[in-house]
Amino acid sequence: KFIDLDIPEIQSLEVEEIVEHKAREAFHRVKQPIMVEDTGLYVAAWNGFPGGLIKWVMKTMGVDGLGRILRDYDRTTVVKACVGLCNGREVKIFTGVVEGTVVECPRGISGFGWDPLFQPAGSRRTYAEMAPEEKNAISHRMKALRAMRDFLQQSPEFLDI
């Protein structure tokens, strides 16, 4: 069941730190096992910036601005999704990573956020140019969710409180 919580987000380049904080805070509020998720976009030329701060960068400059500002830099990028699962005692974090590049001009209409800018390695299309099924088959978020699923199949007792 989806629960819409307004949790203040800590500022960190590391998505793992953001997710751990969000998971603990969410559990504190709902008092039941809960899953949270966040993503980061790590640009090699900027030593990993904006990382977990991508939401704030996108709010400030938007898709066009981010593509434009990277014009003269190495556009090699890693995108990372972290899913945090908290049972009140501990937080398990599951990570999915996809390597690729930030394209200069946004392409595509699907997805959200920076999807029109991110082109996975080995693909000629951005996430936003892909059908949802195609993107989901390779996405960083799906990799993290599959890791969580695999963990829960092996350790269902983690959800016992």
Describe every region a protein language model picked out:
Residues 1-161:
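Anionic-ligand binding patches
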